[in-house]
From Swiss-Prot:
NCBIfam families associated with the record: PRK04841.1
Protein's name in the database: HTH-type transcriptional regulator MalT
InterPro entries: P-loop_NTPase, Sig_transdc_resp-reg_C-effctor, TPR-like_helical_dom_sf, TPR_MalT, Tscrpt_reg_HTH_MalT, Tscrpt_reg_LuxR_C, WH-like_DNA-bd_sf
Protein family according to the UniProt entry: Belongs to the MalT family.
Entry-linked PANTHER family: DNA-BINDING TRANSCRIPTIONAL ACTIVATOR DEVR_DOSR (PTHR44688:SF16)
Record GO terms (molecular function): ATP binding; DNA binding; DNA-binding transcription factor activity
UniProt-listed SMART domains: HTH_LUXR (SM00421)
Record keywords, A-Z: Activator, ATP-binding, Carbohydrate metabolism, DNA-binding, Nucleotide-binding, Transcription, Transcription regulation
DNA-binding region(s) in UniProt: 853-872
Summary of subunit composition and partner proteins: Monomer in solution. Oligomerizes to an active state in the presence of the positive effectors ATP and maltotriose.
One GO term of the biological process aspect: positive regulation of carbohydrate metabolic process
KW Transcription (keyword) present: yes
Originating organism: Salmonella typhi
Length: 901
């Protein structure tokens, strides 16, 4: 829950001086990206801006305290303030902030700006007390905020010092409106107005001016002069002389003498006790101070001018002026040291009653009350964990003695989950083993099962599927149905292990169970994970359309639950890119891979390896080897600077080996083959992929026999495990082996099998990537006119893509080739005496490549009737009557020129 007072603009009091000269300057604030108000404490920053904000409905106000250095807390309040200003316009950003479903503050702000792009009226956000922010991550995010905020948005920052927000750059570009302490200082006229409103008897203008000069227009000093004069019935000028030259760092003695020592004991104790509260209301005051009517007491303190300010329009929430509050808390530690723990305990109890466990934890920690802290955590820790209050939980658990954790083992489990969320896998097992050894008495079976569920998750994350499976099964055998979270974890892990083992049907069933449980209990990250796993399994089974539909459900879940900035979102867009690539939708595949990189923009560059691999794949499928080489340079640098799962390495090696194949780089392939480890098994898609990489390198090096052994074994495993997509890939590589080793009949046989299987998988790019060797075979099959209709259609599509992307459209019939052909001693006399025009040679090349008349017209951007004329002319010059004759004639010319066709 968010504390309402932190989002309420301070109430404008009747007796405050309206700063007309400053308000006039602020009237043009909407023309600037940043309004910055800086000064030491007590110069009236908040009062001035609250006067300026009066009447502005589309303005959000966020009052900071020390706890706002937590990124998640800062984000939640900032988005909530903007929601107040816009009347709930940014609902997606709000949901992401509330559920902590964003990768970083900058990515959350990027989503916010997408929503604000549809907001066209002036909009303001005030952040008060920004000097309390010391977290560099928040500073970086706010610099991003200022760079990218909409033109109609003005950020207003109040701070005691110059914030780290790139101020100089804004100043140079005239996008900064500044007000400092010299401008905030009261002038003579304002000081006279102030005293006239605060003192019972007026003073002369000259005396008022002298007092203003004595304290350099410092508003807090003027307020203290008026307060002291009222309390001590002395002249205001006497107080002014005492304050002359004083500053905030020397104010403590004055406040003791002139404020605390001049109130009755009851009020003094009230001030000291209530000061421990960062914000306060009636219920908190009653519990902390023991006063019977907290609201009435707060209003009385406010009337006395004791630096108490209302934080909302209803008058329910109050806070002390920061300067006075800090002074009071320091005095409280000195004067009420013995009572202080009990005061904090009372505050914690009241915050708990009002439903603010994080504030309660703050006071329990301050009280040093381990038992109270333990009780709060036992009741609320998992809720805080699910809302990503990880830093607060870690601080709290560190404050508890180990013995207390052992007496409450679920807190040990919580600490272990915190470690798991930070990828500290070895520490998780060490902690759980120590706890099991030291817990007194027989350990509860259910708790032991929860330990095992967590251990199973750690094991699979750490690349140990056998141990993960053992632990997941143990957990599921012992966990009651009501322990849904651990059951979801264990079921998910078991399904993932079966996926790794190639048991796809059972794995799919378990992942579907995981999804159902996770949706039922609103555990959305596991629901998303299970959908991603289901899609991968369906892809491996060769059911790419089913995989597409599962991905659509996952994208819908992301949209509904605002999961766009979870790292898992990158996993989803990546497998979508893989599917699009398989279907030769290369532009969409590339866009999807780039969106995955964008999701991971705030993570280590190594996390982008998989998406970068897909970008290389897209370049290779297009035949753009220059771009592929540039991307491979980046990829190989990442490979040399990180440790990766074997799946990641297999995919990265795949594009490297294909690049070496397309460029004939046998040296690199041989070096890689010498050093790459050979997996012990081939029972899942990534192990199959790495063995396929090995076979491709062997084929490139002419090592046909060992490559054939590898591929035959891969096919046997793929058929037995129903890894149909891998079987399709294996057949295509086996086809290349047979073709290059001169076994043309075997090559044709497996190519026909691959085309038939592609009716199920929909593969296109896997054929295209093999280039001209594949094109030659497909032309022959098409010419035979014996392919079934679906295979014939697919072969024609593949051939079109090869011609389009691998630059074979005119490769054999360009100007240089034609010139060499005409000078060849064996060129037919008919061609020498009636040479084709360059356009007719292009048309002949496209006919040879399998293009229809309509496709040739589209390729050359001319009318179909024009193409018919070109075809009629070239038929006449070649002395042929039919298309098939023209294809055979072109083939003979290519053979004559030394091209293997």
């Amino acid at each position: 829950m968010l504390i309402p007072s932190k989002l309420s603009r301070p109430v404008r009091l009747d007796h405050t001086v309206v700063r007309e000269r400053l308000l006039a300057k602020l009237s043009g604030a909407n023309n600037f990206r940043l309004l910055l108000v800086t000064s030491p404490a007590g110069y009236g920053k908040t009062t001035l801006v609250s006067q300026w904000a009066a009447g502005k409905n589309e303005l959000g106000w966020y009052s900071l305290d020390e706890g706002d250095n937590q990124q998640e807390r800062f984000a939640s309040y900032l988005i909530a303030a903007i929601q107040q200003a816009t009347g709930g316009h940014c609902s997606t950003s709000e949901a992401m902030a509330q559920k902590r479903q964003y990768a970083s503050l900058t990515s959350l702000f990027a989503q916010l700006f997408i929503e604000l792009a549809q907001w066209h009226r002036p909009l303001y956000l005030v952040i008060d007390d920004y000097h309390l922010i010391t977290n560099p991550v928040i500073h970086d995010a706010m610099r991003f905020f200022l760079r990218h905020q909409p033109e109609n948005f003005t950020l207003v920052v109040l701070s005691r010092n110059l914030p780290q927000l790139g101020i100089a750059n804004l100043r140079v570009r005239d996008q900064l409106l500044e007000i400092g302490s010299q401008q905030l200082a009261f002038n003579h006229q304002e000081a006279k107005q102030f005293f006239d409103r605060r003192l019972s008897s007026p003073i002369e203008a000259a005396e008022s001016s002298r007092m203003c000069d004595d304290v350099a227009g410092w508003a807090t000093a003027l307020q203290l002069i008026a307060l002291s004069a009222r309390q001590n019935h002395t002249s205001a000028h006497h107080s002014a002389r005492r304050l002359a030259g004083i500053n905030a760092s020397h104010l403590s003695d004055y406040l003791v003498d002139e404020v605390l020592d001049n109130v009755d004991v009851s009020t003094r104790h009230f001030l000291l006790k209530s000061a421990i509260l960062r914000s306060m209301n009636d219920a908190l005051i009653v519990r902390v101070t023991g006063e019977e009517n907290g609201q009435m007491r707060l209003e009385e303190i406010e009337r006395q001018g004791l630096f108490l300010q209302r934080m909302d329009d209803t008058g329910e929430w109050f806070s002390y002026h920061p300067l006075f509050g800090s002074f009071l808390r320091q005095r409280c530690q000195w004067e009420l040291a013995a009572e202080l723990p009990e005061i904090h305990r009372a505050a914690a109890e009241s915050w708990m009653e009002q439903g603010f466990p994080s504030e309660a934890i703050h006071h329990a920690l301050a009280a040093g009350d381990a038992q109270m802290l333990r009780d709060i955590l036992l009741n609320h820790a998992w809720g805080l964990f699910n809302h990503s209050e990880l830093a607060l939980l870690e601080e709290s658990l560190k404050a508890l003695p180990w013995e207390s954790l052992l007496e409450n083992p679920r807190l040990v489990l919580l600490q272990a989950w915190l470690m798991q969320s930070q990828h500290r896998y070895s520490e998780v097992n060490t902690l759980l083993a120590r706890a099991e050894q030291e817990i007194k008495g027989v350990m509860d079976g259910t708790l032991h099962a929860e330990f095992n569920a967590l251990r199973a998750q750690v094991a699979i994350n750490d690349g140990n599927p056998e141990e993960a499976e053992r632990l997941a099964k143990l957990a599921l055998d012992e966990l009651p149905l009501a322990w849904f979270y651990s059951r979801i974890v264990a079921t998910s892990v078991h399904g993932e292990v079966l996926h790794c083992k190639g048991n796809l049907s059972q794995s799919l069933s378990l992942m579907q169970q995981t999804e159902q449980m996770a949706r039922h209990h609103d555990v959305w990250h596991y629901a998303l994970w299970s959908l991603i796993q289901q899609s991968e399994i369906q892809f491996a089974q060769g059911f790419l359309q089913a995989a597409w539909e599962t991905q659509e459900r996952a994208f819908q879940l992301i949209k509904e639950q605002h999961l766009e900035q979870l790292p898992m979102h990158e996993f989803l867009v990546r497998i979508r890119a893989q599917l699009l690539w398989a279907w030769a939708r290369l532009d969409e595949a590339e866009a999807s891979a780039r969106s995955g990189i964008a999701v991971l923009s705030t993570f280590q560059p190594q996390q982008q390896l998989q998406c970068l691999t897909l970008l290389v794949q897209c370049s290779l499928a297009r035949g753009d080897l220059d771009n592929a080489r540039s991307q491979l340079n980046r990829l190989e640098k990442l490979l040399g600077n990180g440790r990766y799962h074997c799946d990641w390495i297999s995919n990265a090696d795949k594009v490297r080996v294909i690049y070496w194949q397309l460029t004939g780089d046998k040296k690199s392939a041989a070096n890689w083959l010498r050093h790459t480890p050979k997996p012990a098994f081939a029972n899942n898609h990534f192990l199959q992929g790495q063995w396929r990489n090995i076979a491709r390198a062997q084929i490139l090096l002419g090592e046909f026999e060992p490559a054939e052994i590898v591929l035959e074994e891969l096919n046997e495993n793929a058929r037995s495990l129903r890894l149909m997509s891998d079987l399709n890939r294996n057949l295509l590589l086996l086809n290349q082996l047979y073709w290059q080793s001169g076994r043309k009949n075997d090559a044709q046989r497996v190519l026909l099998d691959a085309l038939q299987l592609a009716n199920r998988t929909g593969f296109i790019s896997h054929f295209v990537i093999e280039g001209e060797a594949m094109a030659q075979q497909l032309r022959q099959l098409i010419q035979l006119n014996t392919l079934p209709e679906m295979e014939q259609h697919r072969a024609q599509r593949i051939l079109r893509y090869i011609n389009q992307h691998h630059r074979h459209k005119f490769a054999h019939f360009d100007e240089g080739f034609v010139e060499r052909l005409l000078n060849h001693p064996d060129v037919p006399e008919l061609i020498r005496t009636s040479p084709l025009t360059q356009r007719e040679w292009q048309v002949l090349g496209l006919i040879y490549s399998g293009y229809s008349n309509e496709q040739i017209a589209g390729e050359l951007a001319v009318a179909a009737t024009t193409i018919k004329t070109h075809i009629r002319n070239l038929y006449q010059k070649l002395g042929v009557a039919h298309r098939q004759d023209a294809v055979q004639h072109a083939q003979q010319l290519l053979k004559m020129m030394g091209y293997g066709v």
